[in-house]
Amino acid sequence: MLALVAVTSLESCLNSIEDEYKDWRLSNDSWYQQQLNSGQYTLLTAPWDPSATTLIRWHNDTMLTKDNLKPLITSTVDAKYYLRLYDGTPVDSSYTATDSIYRSIVNQNVEGWMIALTRMHVGDSCTIVIPYQQGYGSVKRSNVLLPYSNLIFDVKLVDIYKYKAN
């Protein structure tokens, strides 16, 4: 009986979150579809999950970086980024750090970053559009980063600090 009450309570809470952010979710869905159909981005699919996608647009000549290393999901990378929402609201930036470098293991980021970074070469600069399903999903991360938020990153892959296979 207690388990039934807990499940019902959880379901009610999830429905409440979905109802509260319904317009925001629909706006994000619509905007993402517009970007997908715009022809400005390349659709990337995760090799580990065919339903996981991210959009990417390179800002550099990729022929100049094609021989540079690409990170593995277990690599530690140095990147610079600026994050905003679909409506232009700024969320975060590595440029607020002293050296403007964000160092992380690729697989310790949201799935959309994993998809994009493993396709980038050192030196590439891109805009990455991550649908909320490959971002933070239905989780509210802050008063700015609401549930169902698509993430738009301007990213430069600066270096692979550790190229680690396992």
Question: Language-model segments: which ranges?
Answer:
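Sec-dependent signal peptide recognition
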Residues: 1-3
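C-terminal motif of bacterial Sec signal peptides marking the signal peptidase cleavage site
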Residues: 8-12
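Cross-family detector of peptidyl-prolyl cis-trans isomerase
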Residues: 13-166
